[in-house]
């Protein structure tokens, strides 16, 4: 994703700040930093063919396209169908919260405010410090880098009113920084409670959390993309899109194949009553079948009707998505 370029920007900013704090830092590290920056943009150019024609102009164009991308469809969010280019500012934040395990969210906020507290404390003491250091050691430097890298893309998509859809997938690259702050939260939590709770109990608690998350990984595989935490999982389909990519569609097709085999049908017609290219799912079928006929959203007396409840418009007002009340449901 284009916002990933923030990594090198932060690298340059932090290098610049280190230079202001210590003049010898530039002399010691200028060569390695220069190689890093040149290598970054060289590989960016090589592996991004769009830049080959006009690197600077095309890079700028990409940023503007990202912030003003015209998708033209609606997103099902908080129970309403909203234009993708007119989503509420909190869209990405809400999706991050509801699709991240509760324990991660708790420790993330602990780590987030812990690091933020140190950051503002260091800012307030800048004038009193002889060296004017924004961080006291390398660990604090990493903490600040991660919190900036987590916040900046989110703030950017909010300020630029970027077009988002399909959850927060456009921001998945910030997940490592989220996990880093979760780790900071665990560290701070342990530092606080170790005086009151025996180490053995703390280890058992963290082990149980680990087992729970491992269980969910196994349980949802390979459909981790439809994971919702316990805050919303029982009501997720009422307020949010579920399977944007249609990853589970192939199982529905396999069910149809097995069910149609009972009647020895020479061909099977399937109508799609949702916004998903169902025929694509045939590429990952575990059952071979050459007698499938996909009608799309047309109404031509199909033998089966499929829906994964994903729509680009409110289905109540779309005739193509209507399913007869007499249809037998599986």
Roles of regions detected by a PLM:
Residues 16, 20, 177, 189-193, ...:
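Active-site catalytic pocket residues across diverse enzymes, especially alpha/beta-hydrolases
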Residues 112, 179, 311:
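Short loop/turn segments at secondary-structure transitions that flank enzyme active sites
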Residues 1-17, 42, 106, 113, ...:
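Short intrinsically disordered, low-complexity coil segments enriched in acidic
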Residues 12-146, 152-164, 208-251:
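Transmembrane-lumen/periplasm boundary regions of multi-pass, lipid-linked membrane glycan transferases
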Residues 49-53, 58-65, 162-164, 197-330:
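Catalytic lumenal/periplasmic loop and adjoining terminal transmembrane helix
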Residues 10-11, 149, 171, 254:
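Surface-exposed alpha-helical interface segments used for non-catalytic interactions
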Residues 19-25, 181-202:
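Cytosolic-side transmembrane helix boundary signature
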Residues 1-7, 94-108, 155, 165-190:
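Hydrophobic/aromatic-rich transmembrane helices and adjacent perimembrane loops
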């Amino acid at each position: 994703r284009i916002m990933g370029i923030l990594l090198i920007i932060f690298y340059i900013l932090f290098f610049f700040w280190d230079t202001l704090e210590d003049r010898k830092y530039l002399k010691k590290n200028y060569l390695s930093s220069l190689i890093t920056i040149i290598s970054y943009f060289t590989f960016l150019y090589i592996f991004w063919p769009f830049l080959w024609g006009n690197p600077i102009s095309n890079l700028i164009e990409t940023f503007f396209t990202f912030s003003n991308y015209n998708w033209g469809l609606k997103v099902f969010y908080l129970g309403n169908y909203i234009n993708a280019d007119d989503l509420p500012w909190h869209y990405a934040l809400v999706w991050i919260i509801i699709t991240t395990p509760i324990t991660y969210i708790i420790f993330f906020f602990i780590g987030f405010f812990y690091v933020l507290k140190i950051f503002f404390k260091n800012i307030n003491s800048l004038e009193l410090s002889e060296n004017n250091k924004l961080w006291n050691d390398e660990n604090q430097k990493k903490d600040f880098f991660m919190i900036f890298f987590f916040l900046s893309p989110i703030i950017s998509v909010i300020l630029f009113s970027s077009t988002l859809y399909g959850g927060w997938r456009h921001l998945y690259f910030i997940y490592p920084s989220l996990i880093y702050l979760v780790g900071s939260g665990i560290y701070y939590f342990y530092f606080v409670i170790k005086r009151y709770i025996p180490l053995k109990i703390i280890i058992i608690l963290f082990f149980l959390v680990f087992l729970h998350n491992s269980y969910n990984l196994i349980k949802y595989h390979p459909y981790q993309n439809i994971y919702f935490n316990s805050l919303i999982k029982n009501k997720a389909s009422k307020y949010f899109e579920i399977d944007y990519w249609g990853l589970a569609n192939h199982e529905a097709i396999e069910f149809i194949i097995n069910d149609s085999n009972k009647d020895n049908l020479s061909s099977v017609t399937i109508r799609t009553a949702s916004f998903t290219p169902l025929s694509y799912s045939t590429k990952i079928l575990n059952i071979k079948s050459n007698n499938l006929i996909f009608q799309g959203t047309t109404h031509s007396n199909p033998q089966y009707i499929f829906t994964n409840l994903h729509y680009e418009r409110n289905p109540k007002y779309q005739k193509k998505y209507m399913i007869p009340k007499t249809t037998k449901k599986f």
